[in-house]
């Protein structure tokens, strides 16, 4: 079990942004009980989860800010963003509108936080009701952001956003985790099969190939709407 009171070599504020219901809180709380500390800051209307990751540079602490539903009230207070070292922007691949709102979240975020590492993640890729296909996800390419498919409930690619951010923040592209993140086991209905994972990887490879060829679909095309 991680001792959150221990000395760490670095500590960072990481903010989660995106529409309500996309799975931000589920994403944070996949850690097994005792692996993180959670506190509520009433003045900002946020939950902050304290998470320590063991890396090849030593233990590093993330203070992960989650909106606690405040995004449903028409936006977040500036204090939510101030002092952030990195961000994860999340949308739900089963909901087109949550992806269409990503530019708004990016604008709000970068207005306060310039030049911080930002990862865009498409959550719920375990769902058979996917609406936003890999080749339709183009915003990160236009803004030079990192993107990952994830599934909070199946733990698919859970560590990748954190590892990418850690490498950017430390300036060490070779940094790795020396211990895996302890996660709650996925429910049976959310366990992803090898075939599902292969299909996702194939679709991502196809999307990357199209991007390299300069063939990017328009977010406003008929198929997307």
From Swiss-Prot:
Residues 8-172 form the Small GTPase Ran-type domain. The keyword Mitochondrion does not apply. It is found in: Nucleus. GO terms for biological process: protein import into nucleus; ribosomal subunit export from nucleus. GTP binds at residues 19-26, 69, 123-126, 151-153. Its main location: nucleus. One of its GO terms (molecular function) is GTPase activity. InterPro entries: P-loop_NTPase, Ran_GTPase, Small_GTP-bd, Small_GTPase. Monomer. Found in a nuclear export complex with RanGTP, exportin and pre-miRNA. This is GTP-binding nuclear protein Ran. It comes from Tetrahymena thermophila.
């Amino acid at each position: 079990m991680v001792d959150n009171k221990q000395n760490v070599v670095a500590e960072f504020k990481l903010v989660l942004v995106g529409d309500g219901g996309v799975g931000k809180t589920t994403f944070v709380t996949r850690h097994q009980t005792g692996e993180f500390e959670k506190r509520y800051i009433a003045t900002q209307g946020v939950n902050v989860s304290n998470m320590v990751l063991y890396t090849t540079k030593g233990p590093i602490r993330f203070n992960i800010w989650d909106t606690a539903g405040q995004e449903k009230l028409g936006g977040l207070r500036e204090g939510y963003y101030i002092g952030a070292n990195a961000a994860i922007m999340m949308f739900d691949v089963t909901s087109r509108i949550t992806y269409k709102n990503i530019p708004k979240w990016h604008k709000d975020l970068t207005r306060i936080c310039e030049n911080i590492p930002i990862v865009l993640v498409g959550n719920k890729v375990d769902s058979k009701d996917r609406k936003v296909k890999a080749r339709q996800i183009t915003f990160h390419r236009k803004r030079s952001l990192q993107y990952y498919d994830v599934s909070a409930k199946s733990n698919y690619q859970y560590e990748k956003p954190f590892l990418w951010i850690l490498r950017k923040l430390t300036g060490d592209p070779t940094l790795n985790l020396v211990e895996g993140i302890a996660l709650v086991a996925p429910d049976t209905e959310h366990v992803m099969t090898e075939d599902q994972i292969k299909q996702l990887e194939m679709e991502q490879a196809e999307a990357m190939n199209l991007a390299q060829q300069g063939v990017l679909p328009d977010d406003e095309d008929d198929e997307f709407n």
